[in-house]
Amino acid sequence: MAPDHDHDHDHDHNHDHDHGDDEFADELDEFLGEFQELLGTDPEAAMELVESVDESFASHPLIRIAHAHAVWVTKGAASARAELEALVTAEPDFSDAHYALADVYGELKEDALRVTHFLRVLELDEKDDAEAGFDASAFQGLIVKSAEAALAGLPSPYLERLKDVPVLLEQRPSKVLVKDGFDPRALALFEGPTVESAGSDEISAPSRIVLYTANLPAEFEDEEELASEIEITLLHEIGSYYSLSDEELDRLGLE
């Protein structure tokens, strides 16, 4: 199995705080955008930024998780652990906090705790989508079209070789998969024997590529960006299937 861990998820969360008006929401979005950019380029500056917020805003869950991420990047997972544990205790329905804590536990090799919080993420994401009236099926047409375009554009011999590998759509990873440690917010799944092991006596299921129709739109709301990411995600899964080298991935368009 090869889940895609390269993206931060972005579910909307409706917490009732004193600053729940539109103006505050806009300011928060602007702040978090600046914070995320700094976190990737200058983590120390990101820490300074998040610690400079007004005390009246500092208790907001999104500010608290931003601070925890800054601690994680600048001081390590062990330092971020207590902060995230306190956050999920205070905000037990905040799925992003459970997700971040699961990743911290993963880095600390606390696999059982990681799975516990991954399962909570799966439960909360399903609940959040239901309450928001999110319909993943509305994106199926775009996802199918983008996947077909990606496959049709493959260079030989991959196009011919993939004719027997099904590309399936599922809303999100199953509970069984997540219990096994699979990321509940993965964009895609490669499952089954690789080409090299296709002759093994241990094969019990055909290879398949799964795209998760609830997770992809949650990550990329703009249709053009979503279509591009579907293609990239699918190509990564093809790369996993064939165990391609970096040079071979370049041929597929994954520089």
Regions flagged by a language model, labelled:
Residues 22-25, 40, 74, 137, ...:
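Charge-dense, low-complexity intrinsically disordered segments
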Residues 157, 237-241:
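Short alpha-helical functional segments enriched in proximate histidine and acidic residues
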Residues 234:
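Active-site beta-strand/loop microenvironment that shapes enzyme catalytic pockets
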Residues 189-231, 241-255:
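Active-site scaffold of zinc-dependent metalloenzymes
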Residues 27-132:
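Alpha-helical protein-protein interaction scaffolds
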Residues 100, 106-193:
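A metal-dependent hydrolase signature that marks the N-terminal structural subdomain at the beginning
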Residues 1-22:
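Histidine-centered metal-binding segments
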